Structure formats: C-alpha cells, structure tokens
Amino acid sequence: MENLNLVSLPHFVNVENLDVEEVEALIKRAEYFKKGGATPRLTTPVYITNMFFEDSSRTHTSFEMAERKLGLIVIPFDPAHSSVNKGETLYDTSLIMDALGVNIEVIRHSRNEYYNDLIDLKEHQHLNMGIINAGDGSGQHPSQCMLDMMTIHEHFGHFKDLKVAIVGDITNSRVAKSDMELLTRLGAKVYFSGPSYWYDKEFDKYGKFEELDKLIPDMDVMMLLRVQHERHADDPNEKAFDAQEYHEKYGINHKRYEELKPDTIIMHPGPINHDVELSGNLVESKKCMFVRQMQNGVFMRMAMIEAVLRGRKLGGLE
C-alpha cells in the first residue's frame, strides 16, 4: 500500500477549494492507480450516475471507466428520455435519484455553477448525495484541470517556474479558467495568446497576453483550446471566423512545432478541430500529449471519486 495522505471531500465541484497539498496528493494517488496500484476495497455497494446535459464522449466515458475500475455500480441516465424534458428541475431530478438510493451524481450542465443549488441547501432541503462537477457551462472543468496537472507533473516532475501558454478561445473555456487559477497557485508562470476578442482582462491577474510567435520558443507547455462555436451564438466574430486564417495566426503548425523547445509538450482538452488549433498530422506527434491526457483522465477521475467516497464514508471507506 502506498504511503500518502488520502484526500476526503464531500463534493468535487471546483479546484479553487483544494489546497496545494490536496492537489499534490490527488496527483500522487492517480499516478499510483496508473502504475497498477490496488483500488480501495468497498465493503458496501455504492451507486453512481452520470448526468450529462451537454454532449460528451471523452469525459463521460472516462468517468464511467473510472467508476467501474473502482467497483461502483453505475446507474444509467439519459437526459433525452428523462422528465427534465417535462420541466423537472435539476434539484428535483437529484432529489429523486437520492430517494432511489444513488450516492453520487456526476453532472455536466450548461449553467455556470449549477451545483450551488445542490450543495448550498436551504433549511427545508435535505438532499444527501455527493456531487462531482464534470463541467458547468463556461465556468469550471475540475476533472480536466486535474488530469492536466497530472500530465504536466508526469512529464516535468514539478510545476515551479514552468512557463505555460494558454492559447485560443479563452473566454468561453471552462478548462482555461480552472487551469490558470491552479497553475498559478502551483508556481507555474502563465501566459495567454489567441484572438484578443476571446480574452478577458480579468485574466490579467494570472498572466500576460502576448502574440503567439513571441511565446513559442520559450514555453514549456502549450495548452491549446478548442474554438467553441456552440457558445458563440451572440458573438459577432463568429460570422467572420475562418478556420484557415485562425490556424495561420493562432494554431500550432509544423513551423511553430519545430520552434518549440525539445522538452516542450502540447496539450488540448479535446475535441480537436484539426488544422485549426493544431495541424491534424501533429495530433499523435512526440510532443503532443492529447492521447496521454485521455489515458490519465481515467486514473485522475478514480482519485477524485475516491476522495468523495472517503469524504462521505461510502463503501466502508473513511
């Protein structure tokens, strides 16, 4: 059995509530699982459901794989055939799941901070289940953030003074918001690039906005973000968007790839728009961590779920 402090949490909805020691412990635990370390022995059944109200392939499947590796009983939930379509609120849906015996909900929702309705309960409310945030609108994406931290740590062994460039549709990216905050606390130096109209001045407290080609030779990590067309309904820049022009200005092409330092890594939360954020034939290149991020996601989500199991004393864990 590995010797480390095990994290206990009642919910896992953002990374801001984690201290650095908890982040480091979760990374070590995920690395332990990846190396084939034993999963905790559950002495009583634990029921979990994945409620994804936005499209997902990687995150949904990754969570379910993590749940099954931990020995949890996964209860199917399909929002397209649920009473949500009849006007049922998220709270009422969760109340029903709680009454049926579900212990933990993994939720992705289009509304920012939807989870507050489920964990900041009023005196007359008695919902009693763990909530794991799989992404809330353009707000936070804690599991993607944590698997990103694991991937960086796995490659470099530390965070202090690493130079990380976050590039692309930053304003609409929940991944960027989670990552920039945590990277800064872990001691990395954050930089931003991409279209200025998808950058908000509120991010200045985390790092400096620069032209991409100025950053390329000095960065340790290039974190590329998907252009989120589905969140641009009221954005006048969407009509003028040109994929080839974006790739030339803000994408990693072969020329920029060759200008990166030998040890630099490229990351992307997926799905990748080929030949927009990244040249399609670089997706499986040596520097690109896209596949490794997905692999690491299963083990990090195992660590996150285990933290909630322990925090809620489920499965006989404490």
Swiss-Prot record:
Keyword Transferase: yes
GO CC term (a single one): cytosol
Any GO BP annotation: 'de novo' pyrimidine nucleobase biosynthetic process
EC number: 2.1.3.2
Source domain of life: Bacteria
Molecular-function GO terms, alphabetical: amino acid binding; aspartate carbamoyltransferase activity
Record: residues binding carbamoyl phosphate: R58, T59, R108, H141, Q144, G270, P271
Catalysed reactions, semicolon-separated: carbamoyl phosphate + L-aspartate = N-carbamoyl-L-aspartate + phosphate + H(+)
Pfam families: OTCace, OTCace_N
Pathway the protein takes part in: Pyrimidine metabolism; UMP biosynthesis via de novo pathway; (S)-dihydroorotate from bicarbonate: step 2/3
Physiological role: Catalyzes the condensation of carbamoyl phosphate and aspartate to form carbamoyl aspartate and inorganic phosphate, the committed step in the de novo pyrimidine nucleotide biosynthesis pathway.
Alphabetical list of PANTHER family matching this protein: ASPARTATE CARBAMOYLTRANSFERASE, ORNITHINE CARBAMOYLTRANSFERASE, MITOCHONDRIAL
HAMAP family (alphabetical): Asp_carb_tr
Family to which this protein belongs: Belongs to the aspartate/ornithine carbamoyltransferase superfamily. ATCase family.
Subunit-level organization: Heterododecamer (2C3:3R2) of six catalytic PyrB chains organized as two trimers (C3), and six regulatory PyrI chains organized as three dimers (R2).
This protein's name: Aspartate carbamoyltransferase catalytic subunit
Species, as recorded: Lactobacillus acidophilus (strain ATCC 700396 / NCK56 / N2 / NCFM)
